[in-house]
């Protein structure tokens, strides 16, 4: 499975040459019905997951699932706004955050919503960052809205209160040991404790 950007919450995975069987052949193509920005496809439970953007009308914004072998669309869930960046999947739950600061958790098998949370970014209204999951915890948002959530219930575990963003970025939250790493354009690189949310360094 390929559950998130570069396979793990540290974004340090990859495929070496010995795992690639040449020559590569196109197996299928599928139309998502909209554009894709920085959302990398996920592979989990014999499905491929992707999210879309629509900056013109916000009418064609979805999280989609396709059959891994055939490319047949299995389900499509409409989001309120564009999903700009990394989505993730763990234990049969797909999570994504949209530009309007909504955090979604969907059942990977059916696409049915399990829970939804609003990420309060205070004075910054637009979310373009990517999220991550590790050991049943979802890390999402940025700055004043940077938070940890229980994957199963959506319950907020902690919210960052130590720093606020002045602008957004195109980064994806990354875990290194017990540190959650995030950043903002021209603002800095931040490390927060993954257990408490306390800022450790900038």
Where are these regions (language model features)?
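Short loop/turn segments that connect beta-strands within beta-propeller blades
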Residues: 67-70, 107-110, 150-154, 193-196
